[in-house]
Amino acid sequence: MSAEASPANLSAKAAGRLPVALDAMGGDHGLTPNVDGAVQAARSGVSVLLVGDRVKLHAELGKHEGSSRLPIEVVDAPDVIGMEEHASDVRSRTGASINVCTRLVKEGRAAAAVSMGHSGATMASALLTLGRIKGVDRPAILAHLPAQGGFTTLLDAGANADVKPAYLAQWARLATVYLKVLEDRDNPTVGLLSIGEEDHKGSQQVVEAHTLLRALDGQGITFYGNVEGRDIFRSTTDIVVTDGFTGNVVLKLAEGEARVLLGWVKEALNSNVKSKLGGLLVRDSLRGLAERMDPSTLRREHLDRGAGAGLYRPRQRRRPRRQKRRAACRPRPRSAAGRAPGSGVRGAAGLRTAEPPGSL
């Protein structure tokens, strides 16, 4: 039942899975889409701790018929770190909604924390509250980019502009575990982003990382070798590792190109009467294509901090769209049981969780 609660008196569920803590105040578009998502999740059987301003959340929940009977609890946290504020504010603003979310995970009252808000603040809160997994020196942002047959997992997508070769090897192991556990990939392959497929191509950092990854091949990861930018979208490997500067450029480039291509398609279909008539015939198919290519649906962020995979930051849509059933993607030849959850996703792995990832 929808109810009011506070971090001090919340308790773990006596039976079943722990709830998911949702930072209802974070994001570019306010609490409305967050509450909408929480209600949809609750109706599908997921228990939710809705963290944010109690008065505003109850008012928003009241717009949803039957919300009082859903497994949603409101956790009061009126403070929110805005998108324009500094990530370091999490240190002093302990009552901020993202800090409350990560504390709920640490205290074992939530299985995971979800936020649409400030990426830096989310990362900082996770690091300060949950800590790192042993053996992981730096967090990374993980992104799923649309590719042939499904998606390619890219990291780092922006957390670390300057990295050491050892970080790339650590992220390869994190991403491998992530895909095995959460995406049912039996044997995900890892590629190292470079300017050529040859082992000696790339910067000194890339060459050294290649040596480390090659040594790890067969010991927790399956290393394919160097890959180029085009391979990300060809599904040459399941995972591509790179530094955060390059990864973020790749991510933003893909988003920009997707918008350009969609714009070209729209222009072509509106160029003359025949094109408009043809567009009517393929309208539904084109909507599905636009859904797959829409940059606002491509990003899901897991903060790979090295502490446990406890934070998930989906990207909010810029505008509402009708839900469309996704067509099943062709299985990859390397992955016997790969799921293809639509388009890209950005996220982070390595945060501690109250329950094993597979229990979510």
Swiss-Prot record:
It comes from the Bacteria. One of its GO terms (cellular component) is cytoplasm. Its EC number is 2.3.1.274. Residues 296-360 are annotated as: Disordered. One of its GO terms (biological process) is phospholipid biosynthetic process. InterPro entries: FA_synthesis, Phospholipid_synth_PlsX-like. Residues 334-350 have a biased composition (Low complexity). Residues 296-305 have a biased composition (Basic and acidic residues). Transmembrane segments: none annotated. It catalyses: a fatty acyl-[ACP] + phosphate = an acyl phosphate + holo-[ACP]. It is found in: Cytoplasm. Residues 314-333 have a biased composition (Basic residues). Belongs to the PlsX family. Homodimer. Probably interacts with PlsY. Catalyzes the reversible formation of acyl-phosphate (acyl-PO(4)) from acyl-[acyl-carrier-protein] (acyl-ACP). This enzyme utilizes acyl-ACP as fatty acyl donor, but not acyl-CoA. This is Phosphate acyltransferase. The lineage of its organism: Bacteria, Thermotogati, Deinococcota, Deinococci, Deinococcales.
